[in-house]
Every structure is written in structure tokens, then in C-alpha cells.
């Protein structure tokens, strides 16, 4: 958002001879809230272009809403869910960024190169992590890797004890696709429980929150 505001400011608020006004709205990563925010921007504020959202589930919801507003151009923000553009696409919803599966290319081979022949998945239960896990497994399983267990956890989870208790002894590593505070909470609880499995991280796992985490488990990601 700050980048867009800076770009408009540097051009004196005018692009191609047109005065540009930026109107902001928040969604808190909830698809219903995102659609309500989009509805206000489009139907009340009369925006010509809507850019956003960030989260995968939000992106799918906004894509579906865009079909009811053909006069408005929708540009995907950071939402990396494949279904925003690959499933029932909308003619006025455009993606210029990569999606979750693409960001995981190469991680499956890296896991096999490290000798991780069996990997458990721990990921948040919504669209973007689904894409991340799919991207990892497509390559990893093709190379002979096995995923004996996938644990899908709620976004914003606080207690990972039941997931930690289910980690099989015979897996070589964990694929962790948790973002921000969720990742830090899991790493803290796993380390406190004596967990010692090496970890692979999704693109949302290595955020600044996780990089600032001081525990030993961070260093194994």
C-alpha cells in the first residue's frame, strides 16, 4: 500500500493525465469481511480499479464477487490461491503475481537431496497453504518421497499440542506452512516438547516474525 501511495505522490497524484485517488479498506484475512469491504469500495465509493486482497481465501471470494461487477477492474493483490484464476475465472479479475504452488518449486528436490524420504505436513486450513502443499508434493512425490500424514490446522491457532503428539517417529522432516504468529507458536511449542525434526518451510513460514524467533527450531528451517 505504501509503495502505491509513494508512486502516486511522486507523480503529483496524476497518471496519464488522470487524477488518482487511493481509497483504503481492511479485511483482516476473512473472506466475508473482504467481500463487504470490496462491496463498499465498488458500490459506494465507485472505484474504477480494486487491488487486493492478500489472503488466499479472500482472493477466491473477491474473484467470485467481481463477476457481479463487470464495470470494475479487479487486480489480485498478494493472494496466492490457485483457484482465483485457474478455477472458474472471472473476465475482469487479473493476476500478475505467482501463486502458492509455483513458490514451492524446487523444495521437493531439496528435501530428497537432504535424504528426507518421509515428510509430515503441518499447514493452515485454507486455500493458500493448499496450493503450497500441492506444489511441494507434486515434485517431492514424483521423486519418490512419501507424505504419511497431513495436519490441517485452523488459522490463528494457539495450541498445537495435539498436532505435535501426532508427529510420527519415522518421518525424516516436517513441512511447515504456517504464517506469522502461527509459525512462532508452533515452533515454540514444538521446541518446548523436545521436538527435533528438521523442517521445511512454505513461503509464508519464513516471514519476519519467524526470522526474529530466537529458538533452535528456527535454525533448522
Q: Where are the regions a protein language model picked out?
A:
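Extracellular/periplasmic periplasmic-binding protein-like sensory domains
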Residues: 190-221
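Periplasmic-binding protein-like
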Residues: 41-55, 73-77, 118-123, 171-180, ...
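Short, well-ordered alpha-helical microsegments
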Residues: 58-60, 104, 183-184, 207-211
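Short, polar/charged alpha-helical segment
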Residues: 1-16, 135-141
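Short glycine-enriched loops at secondary-structure junctions
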Residues: 28, 78-82, 125-128, 205-207
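Beta-alpha junction/loop-to-helix N-cap segments that form part of ligand/metal-binding clefts
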Residues: 10-84, 96, 154-158
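A short helix->loop->beta-strand "cap" motif at the edges of active sites that frequently abuts
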Residues: 69-73, 145, 195-198, 219
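Extracellular/periplasmic Venus flytrap/periplasmic-binding protein
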Residues: 33-36, 82-85, 91-194
Amino acid at each position: 500500500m505504501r509503495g502505491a501511495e509513494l508512486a502516486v505522490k511522486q507523480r503529483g497524484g496524476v497518471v496519464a493525465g488522470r487524477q488518482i485517488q487511493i481509497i483504503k479498506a481492511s479485511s483482516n484475512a476473512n473472506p466475508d469481511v473482504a467481500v463487504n469491504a470490496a462491496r463498499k469500495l465498488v458500490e459506494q465509493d465507485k472505484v474504477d480499479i480494486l487491488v487486493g486482497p492478500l489472503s488466499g481465501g479472500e482472493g477466491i471470494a473477491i474473484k467470485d464477487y467481481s463477476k457481479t461487477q463487470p464495470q470494475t477492474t479487479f487486480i489480485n493483490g498478494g493472494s496466492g490461491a490457485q483457484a482465483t484464476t485457474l478455477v472458474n475465472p472471472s473476465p475482469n479479475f487479473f493476476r500478475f503475481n505467482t501463486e502458492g504452488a509455483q513458490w514451492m518449486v524446487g523444495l521437493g528436490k531439496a528435501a530428497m537431496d537432504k535424504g528426507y524420504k518421509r515428510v509430515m505436513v503441518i499447514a493452515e486450513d485454507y486455500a493458500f497453504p493448499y496450493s503450497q502443499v500441492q506444489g511441494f508434493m507434486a515434485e517431492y512425490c514424483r521423486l519418490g518421497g512419501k507424505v504419511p500424514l497431513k495436519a490441517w490446522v485452523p488459522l490463528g491457532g494457539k495450541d498445537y499440542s495435539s498436532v505435535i503428539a501426532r508427529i510420527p517417529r519415522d518421518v525424516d522432516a516436517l513441512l511447515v506452512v504456517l504464517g506469522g504468529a502461527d509459525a512462532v507458536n508452533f515452533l515454540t511449542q514444538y521446541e518446548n516438547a523436545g521436538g527435533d525434526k528438521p523442517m521445511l518451510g512454505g513461503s509464508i513460514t519464513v516471514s519476519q516474525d519467524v526470522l526474529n524467533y530466537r529458538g533452535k527450531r528456527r535454525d533448522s528451517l
